[in-house]
C-alpha cells in the first residue's frame, strides 16, 4: 500500500529542482527547510527529500561565499590581513605607526 503525501508536503526533490538565483534566497529556503524538519511533521520520504535539498543548498551557499571571498581578495590584493582580537580593542595605541 503506497503512502500518499500530506497536503502541505512538497514533492520529493530528485536533484532536478533548480537552485535559487542568489545566496540570500538559498539561505532563506534552507532556513525554511530546517524549520520544517525540526517541526517533526514530515514523513520519512519528505524528510529525506528535504535533507537532499538542504545539502544542495548548503553546497550552493558555500560556492557563493567562496566566489565572493575570491572577488574580495582580487579587489584588496595583498592588503588582506587577519584581524587580531586585540586590534579593535586598543585604546588609541598605534603599534603600526
From Swiss-Prot:
The keyword Acetylation does not apply. GO terms for molecular function: exodeoxyribonuclease VII activity. GO terms for biological process: DNA catabolic process. InterPro entries: Exonuc_VII_S, Exonuc_VII_ssu_sf. Its EC number is 3.1.11.6. Bidirectionally degrades single-stranded DNA into large acid-insoluble oligonucleotides, which are then degraded further into small acid-soluble oligonucleotides. Heterooligomer composed of large and small subunits. This is Exodeoxyribonuclease 7 small subunit. It comes from Burkholderia ambifaria (strain MC40-6). The gene is xseB.
Amino acid at each position: 500500500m503506497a503512502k500518499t503525501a500530506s497536503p502541505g508536503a512538497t514533492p520529493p526533490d530528485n536533484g532536478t529542482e533548480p537552485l535559487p538565483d542568489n545566496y540570500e534566497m538559498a539561505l532563506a529556503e534552507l532556513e525554511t527547510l530546517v524549520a520544517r524538519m525540526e517541526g517533526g511533521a514530515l514523513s520519512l520520504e519528505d524528510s529525506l527529500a528535504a535533507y537532499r535539498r538542504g545539502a544542495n543548498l548548503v553546497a550552493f551557499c558555500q560556492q557563493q561565499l567562496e566566489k565572493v571571498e575570491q572577488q574580495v581578495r582580487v579587489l584588496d590584493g595583498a592588503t588582506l590581513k587577519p584581524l587580531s582580537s586585540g586590534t579593535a580593542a586598543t585604546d588609541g595605541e598605534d603599534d603600526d605607526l
